[in-house]
Design a protein with these regions (language model features):
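Short secondary-structure boundary segments
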Residues: 35-36, 97-99, 128-129
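Charged helix-capping and loop-helix junction motifs
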Residues: 48-53, 84, 108-113
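Short, flexible loop segments at boundaries between secondary-structure elements
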Residues: 122-132
Length: 132
């Protein structure tokens, strides 16, 4: 069993990671961090760069959590990658960070969170970044 978190290097991604880490500690299970890009990782700001990956690994190691980092560039979109990781690692929970989007933005771009919420076979925890 595991907790899967969809991670992007953003305030929303950090909020999701923090919540997922707490869930993993409470459940005594493994954390699966999914960070993916469909296209060119050099221009996709959602794709963690090498220094961000190192920082993420250090943070997870320091917390003493069993973890797996899936950092991929494939043809599948983020929702497909998160759902595939959840199935592969028998997730008991998926954690996602949410951000505000306009109705038009949702219509044109689609929503990774919406697809995961609708298609996941386990509970999904959706969190927002703290407001400052």
């Amino acid at each position: 069993m595991s907790v899967v978190v969809g991670y992007v290097p953003s305030p929303e991604g950090e909020a999701a990671l923090e919540h997922a880490m707490r869930e993993v500690a409470q459940r005594a299970t493994r954390l699966v961090v999914v960070n993916t890009s469909r296209g060119d990782a050099l221009v996709d700001q959602r794709y963690a760069q090498p220094d961000q990956v190192r920082t993420l690994e250090e943070k997870l190691d320091a917390a003493g959590l069993e973890h797996v980092l899936q950092h991929t560039i494939r043809g599948r979109d983020a929702a497909e990658e998160i759902l595939a990781a959840a199935a592969e690692h028998r997730a008991e929970l998926i954690v996602l960070g949410l951000r505000r989007r306009t109705p038009v933005g949702k219509l044109i771009m689609g929503s990774t969170a919406q697809r995961v919420l609708l298609d996941a076979l386990c509970p999904v925890l959706a969190v927002k970044a703290p407001t400052s």
